[in-house]
Regions:
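Extracellular glycoside hydrolase catalytic/binding regions
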Residues: 1-108
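Aromatic-rich peripheral "rim/lid" segments of glycoside hydrolase catalytic domains that contact
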Residues: 90-152
Length: 152
């Protein structure tokens, strides 16, 4: 499901797909189908241990994407078919995490797509409560997210 390289396909040169939802505590905070009991702690980026040290941050994202980077070095195509954050993740946390994700995907020459363009993971009509939206032809545009996406 886009979280591990399929080793058996490597000799065949078949392109592979990765999902950029790691860690789920960021990407799926309060998403009923993942965070079923609302048990994920309030997200920060990076995610910190109780003592303030980094539990999950850019280094762990680098480790997560490294196997797909190795495929690219072998000339095997890779795309990130899904990324984004559910609309309950605080906007500033989402943007900081997404910046790291997109930077790493670019570093590995991996193309990407949002889970959805319009809706709870999207740049339009996401229904986030902590965004100052712009009107875009009758839709609510998240300009900060759009600017970040355009950077990559």
């Amino acid at each position: 499901m886009g979280t591990k390289v399929v080793e058996g396909l490597i000799p065949l040169g078949v392109p592979q797909s990765v999902h950029a939802y790691y860690p789920a505590q960021i990407s799926h905070y309060r998403a009923s189908w993942v965070d079923r009991n609302s048990s994920f702690p309030d997200p920060t980026w990076p995610i910190l241990n109780p003592d303030g040290s980094v539990k999950i941050g850019r280094k762990q994202l680098e480790d997560y994407f490294a196997p797909w980077g190795e495929l690219r070095k072998k000339g095997i195509g890779v795309h990130c078919g899904e990324t984004g954050c559910f609309n309950r993740t605080p906007h500033e946390v989402f943007l900081a995490w997404m910046e790291d994700v997109l930077d790493l995907l670019k570093m590995h020459d991996i193309g990407w797509a949002l889970w959805n363009f319009r809706g709870s993971f999207g740049v339009l009509d996401s229904d986030r409560k902590d965004v100052a939206y712009e009107d875009f032809h009758g839709h609510k545009l998240d300009r900060k997210l759009l600017n970040l996406l355009q950077k990559y």
